[in-house]
């Protein structure tokens, strides 16, 4: 586990809390001061956590949310492959690709303060 997102829908704030896992050390490129947001792909039933990488040319890294909530109402996160472009994402656990150019429906992006609709064609 790398980190977890605390689901606080009953409160108006969303927060990010670090895990004590040693895997966090492997993710040295994560900069918690940079903006972050969350993406939900409705037809895949997948949540993704995205953040900018400060030491690589790749714009974002995707993390796949575990399907179930933990007892403390947190989404636990596991690493997925890097995203070389905005056109598609490859889910390494299932070899499933999602082509944003062919997508015509909207998803949801959660940042630290609000929830907004997202059209995948403009991601």
From Swiss-Prot:
Entry keywords, A to Z: Membrane, Transmembrane, Transmembrane helix
- Is this entry keyworded Transmembrane? yes
- Keyword Transmembrane helix (UniProt): yes
Subcellular locations according to the entry = Membrane
Provide the transmembrane region boundaries.
34-53
Q: Which GO terms of the cellular component aspect does the record hold?
A: membrane
Topology term for the membrane: Single-pass membrane protein
Where is this chain primarily localised?
membrane
Other comment: Partially overlaps LHP1.
- Record-given protein name: Putative uncharacterized protein YDL050C
């Amino acid at each position: 586990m790398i980190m977890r997102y605390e689901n606080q829908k009953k409160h108006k704030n969303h927060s990010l809390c670090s895990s004590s896992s040693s895997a966090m050390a492997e993710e040295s490129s994560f900069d918690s001061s940079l903006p972050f947001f969350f993406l939900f792909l409705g037809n895949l039933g997948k949540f993704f956590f995205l953040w900018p990488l400060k030491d690589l040319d790749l714009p974002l890294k995707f993390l796949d949310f575990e399907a179930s909530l933990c007892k403390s109402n947190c989404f636990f996160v596991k690493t997925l492959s890097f995203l070389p472009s905005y056109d598609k994402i490859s889910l390494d656990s299932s070899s499933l690709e999602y082509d944003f150019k062919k997508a015509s429906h909207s998803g949801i992006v959660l940042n630290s303060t609000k929830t907004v609709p997202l059209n995948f064609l403009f991601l």
